[in-house]
């Protein structure tokens, strides 16, 4: 064997050893391109977003429907005055009638001819 072939065998064995050893943890929190690709661990975790043995935080389970207390008030009472009172309806009607009278007076004061009549 040549010296070059021996070096190649040694380098292949080194690569296999490096492949089999566990990935070293990296404490760098940066997500720039240089930091994402500097090692296999960071590429998997930062570049691809793959994490192993990371437990997800879970929400507490919601109480079942029979345990939820029924509110004593109706929905319309709980809302912020969603139902209009009769007094406020009367005020609105009176204002609308007053505005209608004023606008009709303004229309009568105009001295225009009928629509469609050519001058």
From Swiss-Prot:
Region Disordered, annotated ranges: 65-119
Localization (cell): Host nucleus, Host nucleolus
Residue ranges with Polar residues bias: 71-87
Highest rank taxon of the organism: Viruses
Keywords: Activator, Host nucleus, Host-virus interaction, RNA-binding, Transcription, Transcription regulation
GO cellular component: host cell nucleolus
Region spans: Core: 43-53
Broad class of where this protein is predominantly found: host cell
Motif (Nuclear localization signal, and RNA-binding (TAR)): 54-60
Location of the region described as Cysteine-rich in the Swiss-Prot/TrEMBL record: 26-42
Transmembrane segments: none
GO biological process: positive regulation of viral transcription
Protein family per UniProt: Belongs to the lentiviruses Tat family.
Miscellaneous comment: The 155 isolate is from a monkey imported from Kenya.
Function according to Swiss-Prot or TrEMBL: Transcriptional activator that increases RNA Pol II processivity, thereby increasing the level of full-length viral transcripts. Recognizes a hairpin structure at the 5'-LTR of the nascent viral mRNAs referred to as the transactivation responsive RNA element (TAR) and recruits the cyclin T1-CDK9 complex (P-TEFb complex) that will in turn hyperphosphorylate the RNA polymerase II to allow efficient elongation. The CDK9 component of P-TEFb and other Tat-activated kinases hyperphosphorylate the C-terminus of RNA Pol II that becomes stabilized and much more processive. Extracellular circulating Tat can be endocytosed by surrounding uninfected cells via the binding to several surface receptors. Endosomal low pH allows Tat to cross the endosome membrane to enter the cytosol and eventually further translocate into the nucleus, thereby inducing severe cell dysfunctions ranging from cell activation to cell death. Through.
Name the UniProt record assigns to this protein: Protein Tat
Gene: tat
């Amino acid at each position: 064997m040549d010296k070059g072939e021996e070096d190649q065998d040694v380098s292949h064995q080194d690569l296999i050893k490096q492949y089999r050893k566990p990935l070293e943890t990296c404490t760098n929190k940066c997500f720039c391109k240089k930091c994402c690709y500097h090692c296999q661990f960071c590429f998997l975790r930062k570049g691809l977003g793959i994490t192993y043995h990371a437990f997800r935080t879970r929400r507490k389970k919601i109480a079942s429907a029979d345990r939820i207390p029924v509110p004593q008030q109706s929905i319309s009472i709980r809302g912020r005055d969603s139902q209009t009172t009769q007094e406020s309806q009367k005020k609105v009607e009176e204002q609308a009638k007053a505005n209608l009278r004023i606008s009709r007076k303004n229309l009568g004061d105009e001295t225009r001819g009928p629509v469609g009549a050519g001058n």
